[in-house]
From Swiss-Prot:
Quaternary organization: Homodimer.
Originating species: Picea abies (Norway spruce)
UniProt name for this protein: Probable cinnamyl alcohol dehydrogenase 7/8
Annotated GO biological process: lignin biosynthetic process
Required co-factors: Zn(2+)
C-alpha cells in the first residue's frame, strides 16, 4: 500500500502504561492506500479483552495504546481501488485489520487464524506504523477487513456483534450447533454469554444458562429468553442435569474447573472454549473418553462470518443489551467492567465526544 497523501492527525483515548488509565492522545493515521477506507467512528464497544491488553496481562502490550475493536462508523473516503464500499455507508471493523492473504487459513476464509494476522490495535501495520483502535475519531482500514452494517440494525446495537456476536456465531455454525431443539448450555453470562443466549435462541436451540449464582436468573429467563438456569454451586441440581446438554459454550475469561461442566454433556457432547484464559485449566480424561465428549476452541470469526452475524441478527431481530456511555466516562466504565457491573456490554458514543474539534 503506497503513500498517496499527506498524513492526517486524529485524537483518541489511549493507555500510556499498564495502569490502563485512558486519556486523550493525538496521533497520525497511516496514509490511505488504494484499497483502504477511512472510517469516521460513531460507536465502539468495550470488550473484556480490552482490559487484558490495557493492563498488559499477556505481557505483549505496547504503549501508547488506543483500544477498541467493536467499531461502527461511516465511510468518509475510499481508496482508488475500493469497490466494496461507498462514501456515506455505515460499516464495522472488528478484531483484525490485516493478514497475509496467502496461507491456507486466509485462502480458506479463516483470516482470524492466520499467523500473520494484524490486530486492530496493539499491533503493527504492513507499513510499520502501529495499529490503533476505535476509541478514536477515525481509522484507516483495508476494505477486506471492513463489513457492512445492515440498514435495519441500529448502529449502537451492531457494535458488540463485531466481537461478542461473531465469537458465538462462528462456533455455532462450524460445530453444527444450529439444529432446532438441540440443548445448548451457555457458561457465563457476560457480554459474550448474553449474545450466546440470544443467537442460540434465534437458531431454535433449547438454552440453559450456567452461572455461579442465581442473581442473573430472572434476567436470563425473562429478558434474554433462556429456557433454563443452572447454578453451578448447587450440587444437587448439577447432578440432576448430568448428561443433558448437547453443547456448552464456555465464555468465562478466568481460570475455572472444567469437570463439572463436562459432566453435563451427553455422549458426543462438545464443550467449546471461547474465553481467553492465560493459565492452565484442568480435567480428568475419563469424563471425555467415557462419553466420547470433546473440548474444542474457537476464536472470533472470519470476515465472511462477521458479515453473516450482522445479517443474521438483523434478519432475526437479535439485539445486544447495552449501556451507551461517553468517552469522558470510559475509565469508570472500565472499572465497572472489572466488577462485572454492566448489562451486558458498554458501547462508547465516540462521535458525540467531538474528538477532533
Amino acid at each position: 500500500m503506497g503513500s498517496l497523501e499527506s498524513e492526517r492527525t486524529v485524537t483518541g483515548y489511549a493507555a500510556r502504561d499498564s495502569s490502563g488509565h485512558l486519556s486523550p492522545y493525538t496521533y497520525t493515521l497511516r496514509n490511505k492506500g488504494p484499497e483502504d477506507v477511512i472510517v469516521r467512528v460513531i460507536y465502539c464497544g468495550i470488550c473484556h479483552s480490552d482490559l487484558v491488553q490495557m493492563h498488559n496481562e499477556m505481557g505483549m502490550s505496547n504503549y501508547p495504546m488506543v483500544p477498541g475493536h467493536e467499531v461502527v462508523g461511516v465511510v468518509t473516503e475510499i481508496g482508488s481501488e475500493v469497490k466494496k464500499f461507498k462514501v456515506g455507508e455505515h460499516v464495522g471493523v472488528g478484531c483484525i485489520v490485516g493478514s497475509c492473504r496467502s496461507c491456507s487459513n486466509c485462502n480458506g476464509s479463516m483470516e482470524q487464524y492466520c499467523s500473520k494476522r494484524i490486530w486492530t490495535y496493539n499491533d503493527v501495520n504492513h507499513d510499520g506504523t502501529p495499529t490503533q483502535g476505535g476509541f478514536a475519531s477515525s481509522m484507516v482500514v483495508d476494505q477486506m477487513f471492513v463489513v457492512r452494517i445492515p440498514e435495519n440494525l441500529p448502529l449502537e446495537q451492531a457494535a458488540p456483534l463485531l466481537c461478542a456476536g461473531v465469537t458465538v456465531y462462528s462456533p455455532m455454525k462450524h460445530f453444527g450447533m444450529t439444529e432446532p431443539g438441540k440443548k445448548c448450555g451457555i457458561l457465563g453470562l457476560g457480554g459474550v454469554g448474553h449474545m450466546g443466549v440470544k443467537i442460540a435462541k434465534a437458531f431454535g436451540l433449547h438454552v440453559t444458562v450456567i452461572s455461579s449464582s442465581d442473581k442473573k436468573k430472572e434476567e436470563a429467563l425473562e429478558v434474554l429468553g433462556a429456557d433454563a438456569y443452572l447454578v453451578s454451586k448447587d450440587a444437587e441440581k448439577m447432578q440432576e442435569a448430568a448428561e443433558s446438554l448437547d453443547y456448552i459454550m464456555d465464555t468465562i475469561p478466568v481460570a475455572h474447573p472444567l469437570e463439572p461442566y463436562l459432566a453435563l454433556l451427553k455422549t458426543n457432547g462438545k464443550l467449546v472454549m471461547l474465553g481467553v484464559v492465560p493459565e492452565p485449566l484442568h480435567f480428568v480424561t475419563p469424563l471425555l473418553i467415557l462419553g466420547r465428549r470433546s473440548i474444542a476452541g474457537s476464536f472470533i470469526g472470519s470476515m465472511e462470518e462477521t458479515q453473516e452475524t450482522l445479517d443474521f441478527c438483523a434478519e432475526k431481530k437479535v439485539s445486544s443489551m447495552i449501556e451507551v456511555v461517553g468517552l469522558d466516562y470510559i475509565n469508570t466504565a472500565m472499572e465497572r467492567l472489572v466488577k462485572n457491573d454492566v448489562r451486558y456490554r458498554f458501547v462508547v458514543d465516540v462521535a458525540a465526544s467531538n474528538l477532533d474539534k
